[in-house]
């Protein structure tokens, strides 16, 4: 709480405060796990458990397995230690081991976290066991919404939601154990989550194998949310001659590198956009909505008129300067045509899929 940072290393425990790095005395390295709550701070490793006090570090005589993987304290004198042999509940000089399947999901404990109601969530190979001091309360496995059986960390958020890091993203569980998944590059630099921490504003900082991701807490009204999404729609997805289409990223994960692309569903997407603007006009009588709905309708009509036929519709319209197209014009060798016919006897090669409009635009 005083801003001191502790580092457990191969040869000692170090503290960093006031721009000074200090080697802590009285511990036997290596130190692999550090946990703190309120005024209680513990350091653990294969050679024992130490607790910090005003007089320095004192070793605690708790008989536990040497394979320490994680630890948490409830701030009331109790210490939970996860090992490869199960989880130890340490208090008043005594340690109790829980390792059976009626106590945990498995004995390979990798993460511990305390829920607001005081229950201890134990992440193991196989899922999460929710315990109180005495018995198992609930098991959380992929059947209950966990994204992966390999749990890496468990951290309560400021609002009481339990965030469970796995090797396949994050699953958040509310007080009713309802899950919600945070997964893929939409949320994370990499799906293998190593740790989670929350700042004073409730934002989550997630350490992954691909870097650190920030999941920000943002409160908004429904009207504000609509305004944000509508801005993104108009800025990114509307292109001339008023097509509502998809985009792609030139650099994966870099949203600033977006570019327009053609899609054979451009008519369908623009039709959905036309319906949206029509509903907006019907509700608000906004002239802006009326104008944009008319432009969308004109594009849908142009899909037919641009072909200069009685009933043939184009799938999309793009500028002639585009050089990156889906299903671009190409030629086929006799061997390629034969290969396609073997796969699909009804196959018909079309070499000239894209045709220049009469106005050349």
Each model region followed by its residue ranges:
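Alpha-helical packing segments of well-folded alpha/beta enzyme cores
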Residues: 229, 269-272, 276, 296
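Carboxylate-rich, polar loop motifs that coordinate divalent cations or form catalytic acidic clusters
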Residues: 1-224
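Well-ordered alpha-helical scaffold segments within catalytic/enzyme domains
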Residues: 271-287
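Long, well-ordered core segments of solenoidal/helical folds
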Residues: 224-254, 292-308
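Intrinsically disordered, compositionally biased low-complexity regions
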Residues: 217, 227-229, 259
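Extended ligand-binding groove/face enriched in aromatic
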Residues: 288-361
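Solvent-exposed loop and edge beta-strand segments that line ligand/cofactor-binding
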Residues: 255-270, 361
């Amino acid at each position: 709480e005083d801003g001191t940072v502790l580092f457990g290393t191969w040869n000692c425990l170090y503290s960093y405060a006031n721009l000074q790095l200090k080697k802590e005395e009285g511990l036997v390295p290596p130190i692999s796990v550090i946990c703190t709550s309120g005024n209680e701070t513990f350091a653990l490793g294969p050679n024992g458990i130490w607790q910090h006090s005003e007089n320095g570090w004192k070793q605690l005589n708790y008989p536990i397995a040497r394979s320490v993987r994680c630890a948490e304290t409830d701030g009331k004198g109790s210490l939970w230690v996860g090992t490869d042999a199960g989880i130890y509940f340490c208090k008043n000089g005594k340690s109790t081991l829980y390792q059976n399947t009626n106590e945990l999901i498995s004995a390979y404990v990798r993460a511990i976290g305390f829920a607001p109601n005081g229950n201890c969530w134990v992440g193991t190979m196989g899922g999460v066991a929710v315990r109180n001091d005495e018995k198992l309360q609930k098991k959380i496995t992929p059947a209950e919404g966990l994204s992966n059986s390999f749990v890496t960390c468990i951290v309560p958020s400021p609002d009481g939601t339990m965030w469970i890091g796995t090797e396949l993203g994050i699953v958040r569980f509310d007080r009713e154990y309802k899950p919600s998944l945070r997964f893929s590059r939409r949320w994370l630099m990499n799906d293998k989550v190593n740790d989670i921490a929350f700042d004073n504003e409730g934002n989550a900082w997630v350490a992954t194998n691909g870097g650190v991701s920030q999941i920000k807490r943002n409160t908004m009204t429904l009207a504000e949310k609509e305004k944000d999404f509508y801005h993104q729609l108009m800025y990114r997805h509307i292109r001339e001659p008023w097509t509502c289409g998809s985009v792609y990223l030139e650099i994966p994960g870099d949203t600033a590198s977006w570019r327009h692309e053609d899609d054979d569903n451009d008519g369908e997407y623009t039709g959905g956009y036309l319906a949206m603007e029509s509903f907006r006009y019907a509700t608000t009588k906004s002239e802006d909505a009326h104008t944009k709905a008319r432009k969308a309708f004109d594009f849908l009509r142009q899909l037919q008129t641009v072909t200069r036929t009685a009933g043939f519709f184009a799938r999309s319209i793009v500028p002639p300067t585009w050089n990156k197209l889906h299903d671009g014009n190409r030629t086929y060798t006799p061997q390629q045509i034969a290969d396609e016919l073997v796969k699909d006897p009804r196959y018909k090669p079309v070499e000239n899929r894209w045709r220049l409009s009469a106005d050349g635009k």
